[in-house]
Amino acid sequence: MSFTLLDGGLSTAIESLGESLNSSLWTGELLRRDPEKIRDAHQLYVDAGAKILISSSYQISFMGCKRVGWSEEDVHSALLLSTELARFSGIKVAASVGPYGAALADGSEYRGNYKVTFDGLKDFHRRRLEILVDSKPDYFAIETIPELREAQAILEVITEIGSEIPYWISFSCSSKQTISSGELFSDAVKIVSQSKGAMAVGINCTAPHLIIPLLSDVKSHLPFIVYPNSGRIWDPETKTWQGSDNDALSSFEIKKWVSLGATIIGGCCSIGPKEIAQLKPRSLD
């Protein structure tokens, strides 16, 4: 039942260090204010046994950062720094590429159906992807993607800029068959599986009880990557997670996920270093 252990939610680890995150840039805000806190949070996951770390660039985009007064130079520097902060000996770094909805800071990454053109989506992703290529990560973590159109836009940009960095695309999902936009997860898997350079396709920031039906419904030559949250629901109005996560791993049916093709497993929101440490022995079975 062996699998590669991914880290958990970066914000969860940072909050465990006593930091309050209420900026629209979330963990990305610390890239300017206190980058060592990000480094310390990554260290918690290394100590917990994670073999892949996802960088702090999820919220960093030219559009989103401009809204809070960052210069273009600030954005460029932050993107490069985010990868550097996640470098540890023997650990792989996945540069996070968050969705367009993350820059809107209104929970759109859990809905999709953005009011933006296809070319607008490509322009949004192109500049930061070009910079992240220069940061030389091991992988791209293209994550929490809520709609097929955005996945297609990113795939076109990757081809156009000539990136050869392996990547995964993981989708936020809303039901046993659909991603957040209401489109079929099976169609999402098909799009990624047909693309050049993809190393995995999967699911993140999704309730863990949905993972088995989602994976059971699809076939792919690519391995699956799975990193659900604890099952709590994000409230964009209060910017808080609603519900209990007293036993965050109770719905993590790891053995079944692996049998369905998952080879990389970790956690997302509200899954912290403690939970990743609990998963480590299971990754070695």
Located regions from the model:
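Domain-level signal for soluble alpha/beta catalytic cores
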Residues: M1-D285
